[in-house]
Amino acid sequence: MRLTYFDDAGLFNAQQEPFIVIGGVIVHADAQLIPLEEHIDRLIHEHIPEGDRTGFVFHAMELWHGGRYFDRENWPLQKRLEILADLAAIPAKFDIPVSFGYQKREHAWRFIDPAKLNTREVELQLYSDTYARFCESIEMFMREAASDEITVLIGEDNDAIHAVAKMAQQHYRDPNWVKETAPLLTYFPFERIRESVHFAKKSESKALQIADTCTFIIKRRLMNDPHIGPLYEALEPMMVVLLKPELLTEQSC
């Protein structure tokens, strides 16, 4: 059985975020989860002062920008990037697939009429579309590479998207809904993604911290951040997506 841990980036921040991204990691529950958790504990022990280790959670955005716990005064850029590199190396180290879906905000008019929706409704519709793209990549991987297994999705606990994600996944598993709404999509209805989507806090699930790292790096890559290259290159060999990873540039989106 696989557990797919995912997080989102760019939601509810239309002024500064040109993309909404949902990214995650597909973890073999029996073979990979415990070694993954133990490795994150080792990174906490290696990088974080003893008094701060209990319940510590890595956040990629804080590491990248130097905010909150990782403030720039106490955590120089070189050290923060070292920690980020250690986190980004985890998927390849443990042979854990990485996947994602994204939506570019300026293309939303193709399927959303902003005149009929308020700002929050537009954001949630964008999230729903992005979630479909992400789940489709997960379903593709499960059918093609792990066809004798199932996966359950576990997302970062965010009250704002609970209902949207649960309803979307219910639709994507319903043959009648798919037949009426999206009959030409190859990996719908879902067969290997089972149950409803579940949610947890990063403090409760160490694997979600890796989903956070992957999602942040992929978003920065989409934004053509000139400094994200080494971190993205660490993830790229583990990418399982419908879109070729080398097409991950702003111009191709």
Give each language-model segment a name.
Residues 1-253:
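Phosphate-ester processing/binding pockets and catalytic centers
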